[in-house]
């Protein structure tokens, strides 16, 4: 083979889209589509049509640029097999490693608390409205559900991981089917409520405030950051040796872009379908009831007057069951990450990193007691889920997803080539706006 033929062959090989790229595209997409998506329509539809249209414009840039920034940070380490913790330690020393360990733990643990509240409220709503039984004691319901999940985790972890992987695509398909199924029930209420003469940009219910608060729920819902480190390591091992780091970065960006487009298409279609079926007033009521949008839809169809069609009855029960399955799936997935993070913190600070001083079984037991105990307390207290997301969950995710990569770009020599770009400003602004939600909630 001539030199020119070899170059053409190499270029063709480089430009080709591999099966593994498709697998990772779907993997990133599937990771993001979880229980958090069930709250996005409530916040997005809370302010009516114009704010959700603005969120539609922002959705893809937020999903793509923020995750690409995190991927670039993961790519910047000298070791192709090094995860994000090792990369941060390489750039900022042991202190940086401790910071990233804390960030990962506190980015995931509040999500468990959110899901603890959500699963309790969703089950109680289903019990009372769809099954028609008398209300149960909240503390008992939360304790029962958490003990049930603890039992499954303790005795069937491997089975749980397999079941979780199988549930991703049925859940995505269910969201799409429900979105399509709601089309016959669409109405013009959200359009009729648009009054250009009375629109306000500022103020408590102004467009800018609504979109600002919506950004935090987008950061929370459009989030596959927990898997980005593993994704980058996999792509570096696959591509970097043959094609170099720049090509690997472009390939990762391409995969993240396609995953983000899929995610935005599914979630925004679901949000618009819910909004056209309900109304901004219904979304406000769902927020006040502290339940996911599928539970509210189930109650909405349950309260329909006149003779209900078989389709409406099926949708009523299916919405609640899908919501419960989605929350269980998300809880299990985040529990594993929280357990790993807490085990690491206990080992690092309680046993000075010496794994020989404590057994894995003891570590898991200590971590489970703390995780389940704290989740039960929060579930019993029943704080507003959207407020919890906006004040705790989303800001911590934003600090990891947006601000840490931007700080690394400013400080790390291996990331110097990414300095001075407009997308860095965008990612930084998104991160700061999300974190500033804490200040807004306080005042």
From Swiss-Prot:
Classification via Pfam families: Trp_Tyr_perm
Keyword line: Amino-acid transport, Cell inner membrane, Cell membrane, Membrane, Symport, Transmembrane, Transmembrane helix, Transport
Location(s), subcellular: Cell inner membrane
Keyword Transmembrane recorded: yes
Residues spanning the membrane: 22-42, 44-64, 97-117, 140-160, 163-183, 207-227, 261-281, 311-331, 366-386, 389-409, 423-443
InterPro entries: Amino_acid_transport_2, Hydroxy_aa_transpt, Thr/Ser_transpt_TdcC
Gene Ontology CC: one annotated term: plasma membrane
GO MF: L-serine transmembrane transporter activity; symporter activity; threonine efflux transmembrane transporter activity
Swiss-Prot/TrEMBL catalytic activity: L-threonine(in) + H(+)(in) = L-threonine(out) + H(+)(out); L-serine(in) + H(+)(in) = L-serine(out) + H(+)(out)
Role summary: Involved in the import of threonine and serine into the cell, with the concomitant import of a proton (symport system).
HAMAP family: Thr_Ser_transp_TdcC
Family, as annotated: Belongs to the amino acid/polyamine transporter 2 family. SdaC/TdcC subfamily.
Protein name per its UniProtKB record: Threonine/serine transporter TdcC
Species the sequence originates in: Shigella dysenteriae serotype 1 (strain Sd197)
């Amino acid at each position: 083979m001539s030199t020119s033929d070899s170059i053409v062959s190499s270029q063709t090989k480089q430009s080709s889209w591999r099966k593994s790229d498709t697998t990772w595209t779907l993997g990133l997409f599937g990771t993001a589509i979880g229980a958090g998506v069930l709250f996005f329509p409530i916040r997005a539809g809370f302010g009516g049509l114009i704010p959700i249209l603005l969120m539609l414009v922002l959705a893809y840039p937020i999903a793509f640029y923020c995750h690409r920034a995190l991927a670039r940070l993961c790519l910047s380490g000298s070791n192709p097999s090094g995860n994000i913790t090792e990369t941060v330690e390489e750039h900022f020393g042991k202190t940086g490693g401790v910071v990233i360990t804390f960030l990962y733990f506190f980015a995931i643990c509040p999500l468990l608390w959110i899901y603890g509240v959500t699963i309790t409220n969703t089950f109680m709503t289903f019990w009372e409205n769809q099954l028609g039984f008398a209300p149960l004691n909240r503390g008992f319901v939360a304790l029962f559900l958490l003990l049930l999940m603890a039992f499954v985790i303790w005795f069937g972890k491997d089975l749980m991981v397999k079941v979780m992987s199988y549930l991703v695509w049925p859940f995505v398909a269910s969201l799409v089917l429900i979105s399509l199924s709601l089309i016959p029930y669409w109405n013009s209420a959200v359009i009729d409520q648009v009054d250009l003469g009375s629109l306000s940009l500022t103020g408590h219910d102004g467009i800018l405030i609504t979109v600002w608060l919506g950004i935090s729920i987008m950061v929370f819902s459009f989030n596959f950051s927990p898997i980005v480190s593993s994704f980058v390591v996999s792509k570096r091992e696959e591509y970097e040796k043959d094609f170099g780091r720049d090509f690997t970065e472009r390939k990762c960006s391409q995969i993240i872009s396609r995953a983000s487009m899929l995610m935005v298409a599914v979630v925004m279609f679901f949000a618009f379908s819910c909004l056209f079926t309900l109304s901004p007033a219904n979304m406000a009521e769902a927020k006040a009831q502290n339940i996911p949008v599928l539970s509210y839809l189930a109650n909405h169809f349950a309260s329909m007057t006149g003779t209900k069609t078989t389709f409406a009855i099926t949708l009523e029960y299916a919405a609640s069951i899908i919501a419960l399955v989605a929350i269980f799936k998300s809880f299990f997935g985040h529990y594993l990450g929280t357990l790993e993070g807490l085990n690491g913190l206990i080992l690092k600070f309680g046993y000075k990193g010496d794994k020989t001083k404590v057994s894995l079984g003891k570590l898991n037991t200590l971590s489970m007691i703390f995780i389940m105990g704290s989740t039960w307390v929060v579930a019993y207290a029943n704080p507003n889920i959207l407020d919890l997301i906006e004040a705790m969950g989303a800001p911590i995710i934003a600090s990891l997803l947006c601000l840490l990569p931007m700080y690394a770009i400013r400080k790390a020599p291996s990331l110097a080539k990414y300095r001075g770009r407009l997308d860095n400003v965008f990612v930084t602004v998104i991160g700061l706006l999300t974190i500033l939600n804490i200040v807004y909630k306080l005042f």
